[in-house]
């Protein structure tokens, strides 16, 4: 299993702390976790290309399970939803997960709006995401 956590910031001077925490927490459990940061000012197709290139560079084989986590904030929601739709088309077999403050208050509504998503993580994600990944790989 490979996990890729994507943080989409409003500017280059911002950093996605949640993505960093989740990535490092998963690595502590032996999960192959990677992160990528982008901004809402980048073309969504450029970010999509960067994600797919990073996945290709870390390729563990045709049968490897891939999870992509997208962090959703009020300032990047539209961008992330567009990116999620494109990821679903380009990588139909991967798991797509949403997390962050914008999804935790109305997860059912978010699932209705973001039909591309397989999972939504509410609240602090470090433990929940690591547990999800371990269960997906069969290491409960």
Per-region residue spans from a language model:
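Nucleotide-activated donor-dependent transferases that construct or modify glycoconjugates
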Residues: 2-11
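Glycine-rich beta-alpha loop elements in corrinoid/cobalamin-binding modules
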Residues: 25, 32-140
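A generic secondary-structure signal marking the coil-to-beta-strand transition
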Residues: 1-2, 64
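Short N-terminal binding/cap micro-motifs at the start of the first secondary-structure element
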Residues: 12-18
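A generic secondary-structure micro-motif detector
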Residues: 11-12, 73
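Short catalytic helix/loop segments, enriched in acidic residues and glycine
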Residues: 18-27
């Amino acid at each position: 299993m490979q996990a890729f956590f994507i943080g989409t910031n409003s500017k280059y001077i911002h950093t996605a702390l949640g993505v960093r925490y989740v990535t490092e927490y998963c690595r502590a459990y032996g999960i192959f976790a990677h992160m990528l940061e982008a901004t809402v000012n980048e073309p969504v197709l450029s970010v999509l290309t960067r994600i797919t290139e990073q996945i290709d560079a870390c390729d563990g084989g045709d049968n490897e399970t891939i999870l992509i986590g997208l962090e959703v904030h009020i300032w990047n929601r539209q961008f992330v939803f567009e990116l999620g739709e494109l990821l679903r088309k380009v990588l139909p077999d991967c798991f797509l997960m949403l997390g962050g403050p914008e999804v935790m208050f109305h997860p059912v509504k978010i699932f209705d709006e973001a039909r591309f998503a397989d999972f939504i993580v509410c609240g602090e994600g470090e433990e929940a995401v690591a547990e999800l990944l371990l269960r997906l790989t069969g290491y409960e």
